[in-house]
Amino acid sequence: MVNSSGHCSYYAAHMTGRSADAFLTIRAFGAIGNGLSYAIGVAAARPETQVVLIDGDGGFLMHAQELETIKRHGIKLLMIVMNDAAYGSEIHKLRVDGHDETGAAFGQTDLASVARGFGLGGVSFTNLEELDAAFEDFVSGKKAALWDFHISDQIASPVMRRLT
C-alpha cells in the first residue's frame, strides 16, 4: 500500500492487518501530489507484489498524466482515490478561519472516466455494495484500475480537527 501526504493519508495510516514494510507513505515530505508517481515506482520495483495507492483527488490530479505511463508499461496498479472535490486539508483550514474556500474547492471530477480514457479500468462508487464486483474484476484482470470514491468534503480527520 502506498499513500501520499494529503488529508486522506490519516485514514490509510490507521489501517490494520499489514506489516510496516507493506505500507509506504511520504507523509514526512509534507506535500501532496507525489502518491501516484511513488506508487508507480513501487510497482516497478516490486512486480511480484500487488500495489495499491490510496490518495485524494487533489493530489492525484497533480500527476494524472502518469496514467499514460501506467498503460504504456502495463503496470497493474490499483488506485483508490478519495474524491471530495477539494484540497481536503486546505478546505477545512479555510472554513475554521472563516475564509472563502473557493480556492480549495474545484468541483467533482469523474476520475473513473479519465482512467478509462487512458485504457485502464475505472469505477465510480455510489455505495460499498459495489466493492465485491469491482474487486473480482480487478483481481481477474490484467490492467490497472482507478476506483473513484465520491466522499463528503465536510468530514475532517481527527488530526485536522485538533489543528483547527
Features from the language model and the residues they span:
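Conserved thiamine diphosphate
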Residues: 48-136
